[in-house]
Amino acid sequence: VIPFAVNVVQYPVPSGKRCFMLGQAIRKAVESYDEDLNVHIWGTGGMSHQLQGARAGLINREWDNAWLDQMINDPVGCADTPHIDYVREAGSEGIELVMWLIARGAMSDIVDGKVQGPAPTVKHRFYHVPASNTAVGHLILENN
């Protein structure tokens, strides 16, 4: 297990594009090994939520689910989403979603920053808003 800590608390936080590119670099490093490896890359972070301020309690189910769709089918567009859109639509803590783009950037359909193959297979998708008032999503994708 090799954990990567990505700062999304102290500004400036990395852009989605930068996280997406990190995923591509990780895949390139993994592919450089002479032997087959069993590799799992996990992106983590809460979905829409805001814990403080006038918008405390914000949850945007529609935006979260549209973001999951885009993450699967248009990851380059997802990576190009500006920070202000995350904050506006998903709350101040919604910026955590950029960390998911590390995992998505490492998928085999991404070549030189572009989608050049079939989208990954969705093995599992889940969305829920628990009592903690932080939207939770799970997305398990498998290379084709």
For the regions a protein language model found, what residue spans apply to each?
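Beta-strand elements within well-structured catalytic alpha/beta cores of enzymes
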Residues: 4, 37-45
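Divalent-metal (often Zn2+) His-rich catalytic cores of metallo-beta-lactamase-fold enzymes
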Residues: 45-55
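Flexible, D/E/H-enriched segments
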Residues: 1-21, 32, 53-144
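Non-transmembrane, aqueous-exposed alpha-helical and coiled segments at domain scale
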Residues: 9, 24-39
